[in-house]
Amino acid sequence: MRKVLLLAVVLLGVFAFFAFDLGRFLSLAYLKESQAGFAELYAQKPLQVVGTYFLIYVAATALSLPGATIITLAGGALFGLWWGTLIVSFASSIGATLAFLVSRYALRSSVEAKFGNRLTEINKGVEKEGAFYLFTLRLIPVVPFFVINLLMGLTKMKTVVFYAVSQIGMLAGTLVYVNAGTQLAQIDSLQGILSPALLGSFVLLGLFPLIARKIVSAVQKRKVYARWASVRPQTFDRNLIVIGAGAGGLVSAYIAATVKAKVTLVEAHKMGGDCLNYGCVPSKALIKSAKLAHQMRHASNYGLSDTTPTFSFKAVMQRIQDVIRAIEPHDSVERYTGLGVEVLQGYAKLINPWTVQIALNDGGTQTLTTRSVVIAAGAQPFVPPLPGLEEVGYVTSDTLWETFGQFDEIPQRLVVLGGGPIGCELAQSFARLGARVTQVEMASRIMIREDEEVSELAKASLEADGVRVLTSHKALRCERVDGAKTLVIEHAGAELRIAFDQLICAVGRSARLTGYGLEDLGIPTNRTVDTNEYLQTLYPNIYAAGDVAGPYQFTHVAAHQAWYAAVNALFGEWKMFKADYSVIPWATFIDPEVARVGLNEQEAKEKGIAVEVT
């Protein structure tokens, strides 16, 4: 009830302002015409004039009405520079705080709907820098005064903090505008405020928060590095050390070598990472073989005769290895060495922010110092903690290529655990090659990150190829019944059993966060390595890119992030670049393929972005 009453008062005030055309009194022309009369009245009744002016200013700012600039100029014209600044400073801060409270208690839903995108950014700033963030917003004139008041009311900032910071932060800008008001007789238009002297004042106002940020950043850096100050090298062996030779690591090293930086790339296992050895390349090779088999069975769709494909499963799996070997030279040690990258095969560990120790695969150890590090350690399949899973055995999207490559025949009964892109691609492909595939997904639909109709289309496509798709089914445990492997699942309170020959775990991938020193350095992680918008970790000279950094687990995004990580690591002293995810291509290679660029409908709705569906 109180919120309704408060909102009614606010709306009544706004209605009265426009209904009675009160805005005509808030024009430069009216102010100049009335200046002499106001001055005479002020000389006769100073307290009444100051009080009335103060209340008008507070009301206008509290209701977020247009005209604050004119009222501020009037303060300078009537009261002079110092008294005008004092009066306007308190009136504007009190009015802003009232608008802040109105937004917090009465306008939350409407303001969020109108300024949702700005609110997201401001919330991030408030969470990270709190009062200092508001202070910088108050200092920069290009940020609308009323927008800050309304949006800050939706944050968790305390009212007393908002008032105090606004009072201090707006003081310099108030002084500039009040000073302009004292020269009102010489100003013919609002553009006249931007005289060279005043323009210089605004330039200083704009530069001040940047300088302040630099100072704060330097203080924060010093604090972060304090425990390591005694071991910071005077000189460095490398400009950049890259940990991991997947897409993110290879691109980072390539960029560093291109600009003639001293760069070392460390890889413990296979060059090319997940994409070449376990992900993109082998899965697409499998999909191609499966799709061709499907087209042969349905050749009549192309005006040909339907044909049952005959093939050796071992030959299909061997072809996948052949495709990998054909691409390997592009990601090889030899190629990158030729580009100027030092490639070390072994396990890297961060000893301190500038020192990396490498346990070489040949048994040796090498320790290098570096100005910057890019962590591109990738991700690994997540295996759910199902009772009995280890006993019955399973494969993942990493291990199935080698395991299935040993089979002469395709496993007849396959269970694919997981309804994401990887699970769907594998389920359809093996079904097209002759396996009886059951796909189990705990969520209400497969490919849950796509729009609902897309998920339904994907399900229909998989079922048309013979995949038994079970959504809203939860895997409980694995058992052996009379020697047969069985997965026990639950649906609608009832338990079901599915016999299988092979089980593929495809429930997602988790970032590699242990084994290379993150925990020893205290670098925060939360499913991925915590990074800022420049891909910096807790230590500004240590960056992360690819699956280990998130938020996407795509090869092309890893390469995309690698550019930002490498360039910022090498040239961040002069210029930093924020990672841009505004246009991310996204494809799942079931048949028909599911692809998009940027947000889909459900993501847009979650972000409060209006969409048009055609």
Regions from the PLM with identified roles:
Residues L5-A8, L47-F90, N123-L184, V216-V219:
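Hydrophobic alpha-helical membrane segments of integral membrane proteins
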Residues G13-Y53, S89, S93-N149, L154-T155, ...:
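Membrane-interfacial helix-loop-helix
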Residues S230-L240, A245-L250, T258, D451-E453, ...:
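Mid-to-C-terminal Rossmann-like scaffold of FAD/NAD(P)H-dependent oxidoreductases
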Residues R238-L265, G423-R432:
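N-terminal Rossmann-like FAD-binding beta1-loop-alpha1 element of flavoenzymes
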Residues I255-A261, V266-I410, A443-M447, E453-V454, ...:
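Glycine-rich flavin
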Residues D306-T307, E342-Q345, K349-G363, L368, ...:
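A Rossmann-like FAD-binding core segment of flavoenzymes
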Residues E390-D408, R497-K575:
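FAD-site-proximal beta/loop scaffold in flavoenzymes
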